[in-house]
Amino acid sequence: LHRVDRRQRQMCIRDSHYVNDFEAEDLDFYKIFKRHCSDVVNMLKPYERRFILGEFGLAQAFKQGQNNINGVKMDVCDAFYNGKESYSALQICEMALAAVNAGVYAMALWTFVDVPNPRDLQYRLNKWGLLRWDDTDYGARDWLYAYGLLVRYFRKNSKPLTISSEDYLLRSGGVVNDDGSFSVAIVNRHKDPVEIDISLENLKSDKALRRYLYDSANVPRSKFADLQDYDELIACAGNSVHVTVPASSIVLLTTDYTDHKPAAITGICAEDGTVTWEASTEAEHRYYRVYKGDSADFVPTKENQVASTIATSFTDPDAAPGFYKVESVDAWGNH
């Protein structure tokens, strides 16, 4: 860790860049990284400063000093090129949970999208994005479906929960919001599923928890980079919740949602391969999903989805005739 900048009296911003000494399978990394974060947090307490962690990432391909390949300057994530992309999502998420549990105020992953820098800049190839920027592939990387859940539910102005576990290979963290809703993420580093009973102390549990799953052996990918839907509703039995966490996976449990069916999209019209529709007027609307079927009564599914967009039109590259449906997706993922 090294200091990059200081903003105001209350903050200290640092980055961790690469953790080149740790592979994705390293089971001690969580403990070591949490200790480093705790050291900085405690160092700043006497000065009444908060710690913001910026630009954190995993091991760099070619390592430092070996990133000039055939005259091309490269800065790329090792896991994206060594077959460990899906599994390494566990490590990047436990890195974030370690920071939360150590008292880090906020953090920023390196990076949201690949940077294909112009030739005159220092790096001509920068591949760290949750989204690819490539001539043949602009899709999401597997990390999006893991780290993206933390971004959605470990949100601004939430407060970290105190979480204890006797299992060294279960790494967890959570937050509670001002309205009493809460979210808990659990990373299972075991090679087998684990049954867990979670005791909820001083938390409201008057509605079922939505369970979101990132399984590194079966990544819930979307052609359109949509975050996965929740796969289970888990009722609270008193102050306890029972959950199964599959091997090498991440489970996120949350009550931070409103159970709501977005209003139907109207005015759908298809002409010469372009579909248009009336804009949603709901305050919590976020984007649209477009579907195409063979009959007017087809059922929208992940398999027949043809687009995700914030626009109110879509031009279908497939000239084949068909029927279209459009759904609104809201802030809680309802559609």
Model region roles, listed by residue range:
Residues Q228-H260, Y324:
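C-terminal beta-strand-rich structural cap/linker in extracellular carbohydrate-active enzymes
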Residues L1-I13:
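Single conserved hydrophobic/aromatic residue that forms the stacking wall/gate
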Residues D316-N334:
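Beta-strand-rich modules
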Residues E166-S216, S248-T254:
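Carbohydrate-binding surface patches
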Residues L58-S172, N177-S181:
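Aromatic/acidic polysaccharide-binding cleft in carbohydrate-active enzymes
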Residues Y18-V72:
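Glycoside hydrolase catalytic-domain groove-lining segments
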Residues S280-K302:
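Solvent-exposed loop/turn segments flanking beta-strands in beta-repeat/beta-sandwich domains
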Residues Y257-E284, D330-H335:
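Pro/Thr/Ser/Gly-rich low-complexity, intrinsically disordered linker/stalk tracts
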